[in-house]
Amino acid sequence: MRAVVIDGAGSVRVNTQPDPALPGPDGVVVAVTAAGICGSDLHFYEGEYPFTEPVALGHEAVGTIVEAGPQVRTVGVGDLVMVSSVAGCGVCPGCETHDPVMCFSGPMIFGAGVLGGAQADLLAVPAADFQVLKIPEGITTEQALLLTDNLATGWAAAQRADISFGSAVAVIGLGAVGLCALRSAFIHGAATVFAVDRVKGRLQRAATWGATPIPSPAAETILAATRGRGADSVIDAVGTDASMSDALNAVRPGGTVSVVGVHDLQPFPVPALTCLLRSITLRMTMAPVQRTWPELIPLLQSGRLDVDGIFTTTLPLDEAAKGYATARARSGEELRFCLRPDSRDVLGAHETVDLYVHVRRCQSVADLQLEGAADGVDGPSMLN
């Protein structure tokens, strides 16, 4: 199969590597039909989180299940599914909350060096009943991709921002997560949303969605617009020292700063005394992806939550390097990139998913026969 791998800062390529094996009896293998290039992927691309060896990238995937373990109950071969970007074990008390971040064994993210990357022809997914959801009726591919990460993150940011009806909210950073947070803030009752970014095109996009655009840094402008009071809630969807400082300066006394932007590995000096004296609540979170699905899917199906237009560019998987280079520019016109592996490349000469699965099983039997012959064991009997 093909997979997008990173060799170092500013260098990604499409690599050919072995197809993934079924990751245990509770896992599935997904033939990826769409994968997103996320802002978090750009952190790897820009060298903020260096790897010691090439790593397959991507954590947002939609695709068709081509193999499922015998313990999988909620999905099956042939189902079109979305895969949570954050994986948990699925069985611990933390995972029982449907929040993978609470996993007692520690959440894992696809495309970060431990699990496989979603920007590939095939993706092995462990604990599939916890990680994977069959795409409901009325949900588009683009919406499903957003549900795997960005929309879940933006929604969680708004939930944790203590937004009350009629309040003023600021969203710093108008990438995909920030725009999803903007939409979510309105649904949670905000009367005014200040949309903050450096890129003119992104500010214009936010204005068409009903927000008040403000170039960053925005604290002084927000204070002036609120007669010196400050925003009731501020969502930091950037994750830099500058954006965090702007958020803390823009929030009112007693307000809440909700941080979902991914910071680098350097420590940030939190002004603890200022937060104490102004009674500021500071919260940070990763996306509780699976927990948000029952809330977000009905909103999307009803049309109350509209996130259309966030994915602006679609490219074949082989043009991933072009997508990363363009995404790095962070223009106002091209916001999010969708990579499309060709299912014909996944299936090879096999025309159907069923035939592809049959061939994979035959290959597994052949492999076991070879192993068994070396040990004096009948291969097929090992499958029983």
From Swiss-Prot:
Q: Which reaction does it catalyse?
A: a primary alcohol + NAD(+) = an aldehyde + NADH + H(+); a secondary alcohol + NAD(+) = a ketone + NADH + H(+)
Q: Which residues bind Zn(2+) 2?
A: C89, C92, C95, C103
Q: Name one GO molecular function term.
A: alcohol dehydrogenase (NAD+) activity
**Metal-binding: is it a keyword of this entry?**
yes
User: Which EC number(s) does the record attach to this protein?
Assistant: 1.1.1.1
- List the CDD domains hit by this protein, alphabetically: FDH_like_2 (cd08284)
**Which Gene3D superfamilies is this protein grouped with?**
Medium-chain alcohol dehydrogenases, catalytic domain, NAD(P)-binding Rossmann-like Domain
Cofactor annotation comment: Binds 2 Zn(2+) ions per subunit.
Q: Does the keyword Oxidoreductase apply?
A: yes
Q: Keyword annotations for this protein?
A: Metal-binding, NAD, Oxidoreductase, Zinc
Q: Which cofactor does it need?
A: Zn(2+)
Q: What Pfam families does this protein map onto? A: ADH_N (PF08240), ADH_zinc_N (PF00107)
The record's top EC class is oxidoreductase
The UniProt record gives the binding positions of Zn(2+) 1 as: C38, H59
The family classification in the record reads: Belongs to the zinc-containing alcohol dehydrogenase family.
- Annotated protein name in UniProt: Probable zinc-binding alcohol dehydrogenase Rv1895
Organism expressing this protein natively? Mycobacterium tuberculosis (strain ATCC 25618 / H37Rv)
Tell me the lineage of the source organism.
Bacteria, Bacillati, Actinomycetota, Actinomycetes, Mycobacteriales
